[in-house]
């Protein structure tokens, strides 16, 4: 493969990555903690798009903090795992060329 082909290949990969990122915005990852008392949802690019807190937790600040941290951490992990999978899939496609 010569350098002109490599440039075209890289441009194609950039375009594919942009399309995957755009599509990934529509993917929603939801995590719950405290038996569902706290629920958080992130889109595929890591933006928090929904937060639900059971009313009974409003009187127990410490429990709410613990459940919220747990749900947020799980949500972040799900988004990161999804991003890793996308990257590995792209690398797999690149290796086939």
From Swiss-Prot:
Organism: Helicobacter pylori (strain HPAG1)
DNA-binding in keyword set: yes
Keyword field: Cytoplasm, DNA-binding
Pfam families: YbaB_DNA_bd (PF02575)
Principal cellular location given in the protein's record: cytoplasm
UniProt lineage: Bacteria, Pseudomonadati, Campylobacterota, Epsilonproteobacteria, Campylobacterales
Keyword DNA-binding on entry: yes
Annotated protein name in UniProt: Nucleoid-associated protein HPAG1_0033
Family classification: Belongs to the YbaB/EbfC family.
Assembly: Homodimer.
Superkingdom: Bacteria
Any one GO molecular function term: DNA binding
Localization per record: Cytoplasm, Nucleoid
């Amino acid at each position: 493969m010569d350098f002109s082909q490599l440039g075209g290949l890289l441009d194609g990969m950039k375009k594919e990555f942009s399309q995957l990122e755009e599509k990934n915005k529509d993917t929603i990852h939801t995590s719950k903690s405290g038996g569902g008392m706290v629920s958080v949802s992130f889109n595929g690019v890591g933006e928090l798009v929904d937060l639900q807190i059971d009313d009974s937790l409003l009187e127990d600040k410490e429990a709410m903090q613990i459940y919220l941290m747990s749900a947020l951490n799980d949500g972040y992990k799900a988004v990161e795992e999804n991003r890793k999978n996308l990257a590995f899939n792209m690398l797999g496609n690149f290796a086939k060329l």
